[in-house]
């Protein structure tokens, strides 16, 4: 039954893709006019607000998250701009998942009493170097990871195959937008309305950029304090004058 449903869904996706291909060839689709003019077009919000007078001509506000900032001219070439947009969205989505995975176990362990083998994200991963290895999902009944080199090699191979399939336009995604495929990737139909879809694109990239900065901050915190982000936040709230970024930075300055 499940296989039949999946097959029917896949057939539907291919039929819809064929219909799109048979129709008029689509170019870059501009967002709906009523989708929040504050985020798109020439009158959108700029990175310096009213002081953003001379934004690059190639940043027209056509794409989500365009605040008219490109002082280094990295996106002046259209093909480069297209590649960077794709890379940013993909990394933003990974960062959103990563931030959720970093925060959730520590939150549940600290405030809900949920038992984890190790709730702190970098300490959990470090268990692969222990004698017993790393238990997937914290369950000894599942397969153990005991060799970091083998684990990395498997990840590189699997992710490389998937990314290669995606980049080269595998037949399963034929006719679909590589960044916003929809169809089976939107089972709840959240993007059916064009205005809502345009707004969701902006929300995704804004939150994704915050998530990328957050993950970088989690890495730095782990190196400097040896604690997870939730514990660092609790320490800061308990004693802001002692536990803050400036105090932590002094640990790396030459002593008098």
Curated annotation (Swiss-Prot):
One of its GO terms (biological process) is photosynthesis, light harvesting. Chlorophyll b 5 binds at residues 155, 252. Binds at least 14 chlorophylls (8 Chl-a and 6 Chl-b) and carotenoids such as lutein and neoxanthin. One of its GO terms (molecular function) is chlorophyll binding. Chlorophyll a 2 binds at residue 91. The chain crosses the membrane at residues 94-114, 142-162, 210-230. PANTHER family: CHLOROPHYLL A/B BINDING PROTEIN. The light-harvesting complex (LHC) functions as a light receptor, it captures and delivers excitation energy to photosystems with which it is closely associated. The N-terminus of the protein extends into the stroma where it is involved with adhesion of granal membranes and post-translational modifications; both are believed to mediate the distribution of excitation energy between photosystems I and II. This is Chlorophyll a-b binding protein of LHCII type I, chloroplastic.
